[in-house]
Amino acid sequence: GWEFPPKIYGGLAVASYGITKGLSLQNDVETTFCLPKPTGEEESFLNIIGMNQVPVVWRDVNYDYLKSRLPNYMTPEQYYAFRDHIYADFSYLNVNDLGCMEFAGGYPANLHDEINNFSIIAGVVARQQQFDIIHAHDWLTYPAGVHAKMVSGKPLCIHVHATDFDRSRGKVNPTVYATEKNGMDYADCIMCVSELTRQTVIREYHQDPRKCFAMHNAVYPLSQELLDIPRPEHKKEKVVTFLGRITMQKGPEYFVEAAALVLKRTRNIRFIMAGSGDMLDAMINLAAERGIADRFHFPGFQRGRQVYEAYKNSDVFVMPSVSEPFGIAPLEAMQCGTPSIISKQSGCGEILDKVIKTDYWDIHAMADAIYSICTNPSLFEYLQVEGKKEVDGITWEKVGLRIRALYENVLKNYGK
């Protein structure tokens, strides 16, 4: 995987956590999660391998020095075991005193180099570890998954959390597309976060429908600490929130345009666009152009507890995505008792009924839905109560059982 809590860049970390946690609830499944650059603060229900601690160039390092240099999740014994499985001369690579490659983590400018390095290290890990199946999350780790399959002869499952068709509104990056397609071609099983995404994989990447499965995401039960966040009473003015990356995939301009329509009918609603992204400045300008800047707030990127405070402080949550493979945010908002409006172009709509769905481009329908929830207490209450009930039944434990069943199926038919 590429992301894992507590270091969260987006939905990929949240889903990676949920999937591995769901699998860990079955006593006889053991997961080893390979991450470019762990923080050392990851939870202990799975084994973490920091790819930045796996040597690719032989260095003669003594035990005590290793003890002082390695983090708490890697022992000197493990380091030596990996060192015994270096399979080629990588001395031309840029490595540190332990013969390991450094990772920036996240999504740096040299992302393609990091993806390639991750794949090289996967060759060492796949030679040293004992395992039954490989599960690679999103295109960043597909090359590593393919490499691990070639080295070990073990089956490969890939998990499509998004495709470049979603991220780019159709202006596909050929390098990314080639990486995605290669991963899919080599995969024995392709798990897609929605039927919407599954159809994209079959249609745009020419994959056999028989190896593609929809595997919807879920949500984790809220901790007591998050449950205890108070819900302010908004008697005078209501609050409507967009929370996510402010990029073209997420449709932020439709939120601003819908807000402008709502504010023609009433002034006692405030709109919040929380997040960061390459369209932030354009959205601030658009709100000003529409004459609604005094009713619009841009608090920036929210992390951890702030996200849940934002949900609870909202009377309506809106996700107007142009192309959303799944979209975990509305489920989190509904968990917090916040009625949600989602675009019909969102995968999560396949498993949600107690939400209002509009086309992303239909700003009039979106504005009507926002206005209705804000001015009709019985509609608000219905969506609040029934929405929470619906989402509380969508658990990672159930997802874990379904993934487990797919693993067994793949292993049974592998090589036949």
What are these regions (language model features)?
Residues 28-126:
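A conserved catalytic-core segment of Leloir-type glycosyltransferases
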Residues 191, 233-259, 384:
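Conserved donor-binding/catalytic core segment of Leloir-type glycosyltransferases
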Residues 196, 218:
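Carbohydrate-associated surface elements
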Residues 282-302:
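Nucleotide-activated donor-binding/catalytic signature segment of Leloir-type glycosyltransferases, i.e.
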Residues 301-302, 309-314:
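Short alpha-helical donor nucleotide-sugar binding micro-motif in glycosyltransferases
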Residues 322:
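Aromatic "clamp/platform" in nucleotide-sugar-dependent glycosyltransferases that forms part
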Residues 339-342:
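Short hydrophobic beta-strand element within catalytic cores of glycosyltransferases
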Residues 355-364, 372-377:
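Conserved acidic donor-binding segment of nucleotide-sugar-dependent glycosyltransferases
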